Amino acid sequence: MNPSHPQPKIQLNQSEDYREIYSNSVQVRVSVWDFLLVFGLVHQETPEQVNVNNALGVYLSPQQAKALWNILGQNLAQYEQTFGALALEPQPPKGPVH
């Protein structure tokens, strides 16, 4: 840390429209200028019908998308070190998805 340029203090505030949601679905859309992450919930109504209800879209610059990728990777590595490896199924499980 350079004493002539001290780090600024960061204060985190929540805006009035801040909200938290649960998501079991994310769609990623990419353009030259940005990434769009669309979070939603998957509901399987019948064996033939799966509905995805999109709840929130977040636009990120390519730089912020890469920073998110890095921090998620670090946190997933710590999670797996603590709780064990996460396995991703190549195919969705058969039967209803809740």
Where are these regions (language model features)?
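N-terminal intrinsically disordered, cationic/polar leader segments
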Residues: 1-63, 70-98
